[in-house]
Amino acid sequence: MNRIDELRLNLTTVKNSVQDACERAGRKFEDVTIIAVTKTWPASDVNLLAQLGVTDVGENRDQEAKAKKSEVSSTNLTWHAIGQIQTNKVKSIIQWADVVHSIDRLELVEVFAKQLAHAGKSIDVFVQVNLDEVPRDNRGGASTDEALALAQAVLSNEAFRLRGVMGVAPLHGDANRAFEHLASVSQALMQLDPTASAISAGMSDDYEIAIKNGATHLRLGSLILGHRTYSG
């Protein structure tokens, strides 16, 4: 099977599964955006995905994403920055990302605001909420109170368009409870801005649980692209 047929088959399978999960949750398939996480995969795959109708791709490595976007022919894609962000990468990230999912501290808001002002740009953002029962430094995410304070900071600057909240299920915990909590933070956020209703949650292992709890943006990698095989 050639690569485009493989991707087509994977996409069909994923869309059918997402549709089934939406039906079980009493939701519309059209209300869910599937982000194809293309990190570590070549620009040729992104071009093929675009040919197959994919509209959203996700990357978490700045240098890789910037180089890849320059090699992708489609201009109709929305590029999502989904990984933890170091402040020294912000200037570069705004050159390729349309949406940032991991705003989790005030320092990041301030640096993005400064760089966006210099570039004369604006950007869509999600505030990342830490869903680990015991917060881990390397996982990213703000506490509930911090997330709401970050949302207020984002809303006070016209360079940002606040989309909603983002979360990553705990490595060793109850994904359903975690996503229920994220949904409750989303409701609180919407008291600040009723239009910031999006929930970025759900990856290849837990997207059905995320859909049940209101996820609007799924970040799916291996289900669409497959698994990397390494030699040596």
Question: Across the structure, where does each feature detected by a protein language model lie?
Answer:
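Conserved alpha/beta-domain cores
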Residues: 1-205, 211-213, 225-227
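Gly/Pro- and small hydrophobic-enriched strand-loop and loop-to-helix capping segments
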Residues: 215-232
